[in-house]
């Protein structure tokens, strides 16, 4: 299973395709935080905010478009959670 994922990612890289790496196995292979667990949203928002504060800007680069959308969604969810608590 992991070997198949590695083969698919390698082939995609050679063919200049984009993979947003949303799955568990893909993120384990490349050493990123896996998109799972109850604390993932809060951790992701914290790390994303910290990174952008250091850069002092949220990038509008098209390659970071998905990250910008995720940031907005997570920010809205955290605001809703604060209102409920």
UniProtKB/Swiss-Prot annotation:
The keyword Nucleotidyltransferase applies. SUPFAM superfamilies: beta and beta-prime subunits of DNA dependent RNA-polymerase. It is found in: Plastid, Chloroplast. Keywords: Chloroplast, DNA-directed RNA polymerase, Nucleotidyltransferase, Plastid, Transcription, Transferase. In plastids the minimal PEP RNA polymerase catalytic core is composed of four subunits: alpha, beta, beta', and beta''. When a (nuclear-encoded) sigma factor is associated with the core the holoenzyme is formed, which can initiate transcription. It is an enzyme of class 2 (transferase). Its EC number is 2.7.7.6. It catalyses: RNA(n) + a ribonucleoside 5'-triphosphate = RNA(n+1) + diphosphate. Belongs to the RNA polymerase beta' chain family. RpoC2 subfamily. The lineage of its organism: Eukaryota, Rhodophyta, Bangiophyceae, Galdieriales, Galdieriaceae. This is DNA-directed RNA polymerase subunit beta''. DNA-dependent RNA polymerase catalyzes the transcription of DNA into RNA using the four ribonucleoside triphosphates as substrates. It comes from Galdieria sulphuraria.
């Amino acid at each position: 299973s992991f070997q198949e994922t590695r083969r698919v990612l390698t082939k995609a890289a050679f063919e200049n395709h984009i993979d947003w790496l949303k799955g568990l196995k893909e993120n384990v292979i490349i050493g990123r935080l896996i998109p799972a667990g109850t604390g993932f949203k809060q951790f992701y928002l914290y790390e994303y905010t910290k990174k952008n504060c250091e850069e002092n800007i949220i990038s509008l680069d098209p390659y970071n478009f998905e990250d910008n959308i995720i940031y907005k969604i997570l920010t809205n969810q955290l605001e809703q959670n604060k209102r409920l608590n």
